[in-house]
Amino acid sequence: MKKQILILCNLIFLASAIDAKNLNPGFNIVEYQECICMASHFKELPGIEEKYLAPNPKLFEKLYSSPVMGFENAWELWQSADSIAAISLRATVTTMNSWLSNFHAGMVKAQGVCHFGKDINYKLCDNPDAMVHSGWLTSMLAMSDDILAHIDSCYKAGIKDFIITGHSQGGAIAYLLTAFLIEKKSSGFLPKDIQFKTYCSGAPKPGDYAFACEYEYMTRNDRSLSVVNPEDWVPEVPLSIQKINDFSKTNPFAHTNELPDTLGFINKIKIKFLFKSISKSPRKAEKKLRKYLGTKVGNILEKEYDTYQKPTFGQCANYARTGHTIIFKPSTAYYERHPQNSKDFFEHHMYRSYYELSLDCDY
């Protein structure tokens, strides 16, 4: 009898931790644990050993698993007893094309047209100069029609609160999907009373600094949480290359040809030479990244997918993190289980690692 009462009390506590009538802003540890558990239990998650997985979700039930779409992408729809829907986006799997989506890191405009089977018009933010990762954008857009159709079905069934979540590649796509859906809501395509809240777990950088600023404004008031294990290298990629012309338009570096005469002729020459030498290496590095991770990977994907047409890539690789960052600081006990010098370079990135950290965090 005591055991039954204890179980009942635990269920009441867990259910009250997520309030469907008001999907509150800010980090909620129970919500996050459900998200990492959902990410860990896709219908098809090949090549992942049991020891790397988190437990099954406690509060959410799986309603739908999508077919494979885009560059070996998939998503699932979950629902809680309190009528919160969760859109869970799959992480990278072991297939070549799934990894090519990650490596297709040339940047494209955050608004435009994607050519994959059909022309897909998209807008992720208002800033026409903002740029995002090409591979993950294409992956998101390939799933977008299916996701929108299920959001519509949920809304007609009375569900208005949606959690968007993903781990690793799924987290990167979750950023872009969130921006896409917020713009759909702003344009009137989606109802105004729909609420979105996002948990990106162990996610890479989705776009440039301009997009990061736009995204953080769009999800202000703690509507998008980015959970990071500081020992995990994945949130540090793609590599960021900042050029002089990546700065905001009003900056001192744009006017080195207009230095005041009070500096003197020799000093002006020295300053111009310094800026020229500093800016040369980033320009070359960005150009090389665009060539290989944009054009060449795009060529491979065009051969893999007859209906895919690679985009025109922007001259930018100024990748930046975004969202409200939640740091899971590892404890001594964590390091005993997951050593820093592990030969497994995904040791600190897997579902189990993040789940264990969530049990120790003091949020």
Question: Where is each model-derived feature located?
Answer:
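Bacterial Sec-dependent N-terminal signal peptides
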Residues: M1-L23
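Serine hydrolase/lipase
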Residues: K21, K118, D145-D161, E183-Y363
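A conserved cap/lid and substrate-binding interface adjacent to the catalytic center
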Residues: L63-F162, S187-L190, Q195, N221
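Short, flexible loop/turn elements at secondary-structure junctions
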Residues: Y64-P67, A81, A91-V93, S168, ...
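Short, glycine/acidic-rich beta->alpha junctions
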Residues: M69-G70, I173, G207, T219
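Active-site signature of alpha/beta-hydrolase-fold catalytic machinery across serine-
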Residues: L176-F180
